Structure formats: structure tokens, C-alpha cells
Amino acid sequence: AVKSGAKFNKDMILAQMKEFYTQCELYEMTGCVHTAKLFVSEDKFYIGEDIAQHNTIDKAVGKAVLDGANLANSFLMVSGRLSSEMVVKAVMHGIPALISRTAPTSLGVVIARKFELTLCGFARGENINVYSGEERIYE
């Protein structure tokens, strides 16, 4: 299970999601890649871009690990759907929350609940759907 006392403000998450899409440089140039952003603190984040969505997490987390970042209070934003594989990657790295502007798969939700990962989808505008780990999100 993901053990973390991290709490995340809903408005801060939505602001970071909005900013996230301004930081997807390769997507802006090509229109055909996925992006992941690992948010560690207001001034520390790591971006991973790749044509394969799963690789974006590996790239962002790899940069953070090489930099010695503590992931216990971080959250991960991804550009695509929240599949079971994406959820497993977040759990394996001890990242407490995984967020996307799109939907989770049903198996992704089951795994997130089993391993106490906060899973949020449709994070856009002023809305966010929390599918598991509601206790980490506050107004």
C-alpha cells in the first residue's frame, strides 16, 4: 500500500493541471506524444514525454530519483487515461496520488483502492473526480 500522510488541495491540483498542459513542449510541436509531470513541490517537478504513455512515468520518475527527490508527498499527472498499468507504476514508486484530465479504467480503480492510491480523473476546469483515496484531497 502507498503509505503517505500527504494531503493535496483541490484548487492547487487543478491549477497544476492547467499549467501542466502549457509545459508539454513535445506535444505542442508534434501533437502525438504523452506527457507525465511528477509534482514534488511548488518549485520542483519532473516532466517525461514519450510516444508511449507508460514510458512518460518512467522518464519523470527516473529524473526525480536521479535528483534524489522524495516522492512520499508528490503527485503524478498524466495526459492519458488512468489504466491499471499506470496505477501500478505509481504504487510501485510510492507516489500517493495519480491524476489525469481523462478517465480511469475500472481495473485501475480497483487496484488504486486496494493499494490506497489517490486516483483522480477528469481534473479540468473547476472539477475533479476522486475515485479512491478521498482523504488526501481537501477543499
Label every model-predicted segment.
Residues 49-51:
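Short beta->alpha transition motifs characteristic of CBS
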Residues 1-41, 46-47:
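Intrinsically disordered, low-complexity regions enriched in acidic/Ser/Thr/Pro/Gln residues
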Residues 53-131, 136-139:
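Feature captures the catalytic cores and cofactor-binding loops of soluble hydro-lyases/lyases
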